Amino acid sequence: MTSVSVAFTNVAGLLAHGSKSRCRNAEVLRSRSAAERASGDRQRWRICMSDGERVHAYTETVVESQLGFSVSRRALLHHLALGALAVALPRSGALVAAPLAETVRGAAWKQVPLPTESVLFDIDFSQKDPNHGWLVGTRGLVLETRDGGETWEPRAFEDVEREEELNYRFSNVSFSGDEAWVIGKPPVMLRSTDGGKNWSRILLSPKLPGEPLLVTALGPNCAEMVTSSGAIYVTENGGINWKALVRETIDATLNRTISSGITGASYFTGSIVSVSRDVHGNYIAIPSRGNFFLTWVPGSDFWTPHARSTSRRISAIGFIQNDATKGIWETIRGGGLGFTKPNVNLNSTETIAFDMVDSKTGGYGILDVAFQDDRHVWAAVGGGSMYRSDDGGKTWRRDPLVSKVGANLYKIKFFGSQRGFVLGADGVLLKFHPENV
């Protein structure tokens, strides 16, 4: 079998030195043209396939940076490796180490290569341009796409120092028209009014109860924020002023209603770790221990605590199809999964009944659940597996083409029934391919 190697060659460097288009094996030329040195934004590379005597094939790729964000060595190697893969696979037939989800044909979820190994926390797209989106995560990760999530480029926030940004874990991004908001830890909030071209930092009061946990863009200058203490605020002037929507924190509510008999309420540690907002502005949240859950409906002065319906603690909870009128889903320790009937009373302190189903996860915990539509439901299961239901959550089966992705999958998010993403650890991003379902 003929030995084949791949060479990475900077095309601009070749042109600057008067070289011909033939690539030199295993050599990378880093010099750039005068125009490129002036702009500092683009480098065009040619990836060649050579057996040491002649070039068999080549392709080209452009490595580009924007907003003053320099291309890191890792990002550069990522681009070049993808180009090499494009050259090598059709010609050599060689086995290439690549993510399983990307190499299996016909998979409903395929892995999108990313220039990062950070944990991915959130993703959102602009309603004005559905192909334009942002992805955030740990170690200051900020990525932008303009092709619907097929490719992603690193970005940076102007109001956050480069060294400082690496210490942040950006946990939430939300778009509404050109309005965009991002929050993270240590407590930070950023806002854009032009679809993400420019960002400004919103100052947070040191008296803010808790840390920002969720922000939702609602329109021009308008957004809602929930903190880890359960405080809910709304701004209508771009974050200059915030109006409280609840009269007290969750801790104060539980102290006042301790006689309500909510199991586990006395063990509340003072903060919630997960909160979701539906399309009508209703919220649902769970505390760190998962021993009860809480709901809030617009116009209420307080959160309403609810006892869990089983002895096992709640792992995750949310609204069915992001709509409280359609019911609530919950996952419990050990792979339990349950759904309520539609139109449950979120203001009642009576125990809400969940109909439990057999998720067939073998005891592995379910980390998130998302509805593609009213029939097709997906679940992210511990160990990097995806499970699916085609009957509204009644019966489940494992998706074998994604079960060995090699990283935990934490969040599933759909943007309509035909586009969805799964976010995980180690920079794992899966994109939904409805044509394979």
Curated annotation (Swiss-Prot):
Biological process terms in GO annotation: photosynthesis
Sorted UniProt keywords: Chloroplast, Membrane, Photosynthesis, Photosystem II, Plastid, Thylakoid, Transit peptide
Tree of life domain: Eukaryota
InterPro entries documented for this protein: PSII_CF48-like_dom, WD40/YVTN_repeat-like_dom_sf
GO annotations of cellular component type: chloroplast thylakoid membrane; photosystem II
Location in the cell: Plastid, Chloroplast thylakoid membrane
Entry-linked Pfam families: PSII_BNR
Membrane topology designation: Peripheral membrane protein
Stated family: Belongs to the Ycf48 family.
Functional summary from the UniProt entry: Essential for photosystem II (PSII) biogenesis; required for assembly of an early intermediate in PSII assembly that includes D2 (psbD) and cytochrome b559.
Free-text comment about domains: A 7-bladed beta-propeller torus, about 54 by 55 Angstroms, with a depth of about 25 Angstroms and a central pore.
Protein name in the entry: Photosystem II stability/assembly factor HCF136, chloroplastic
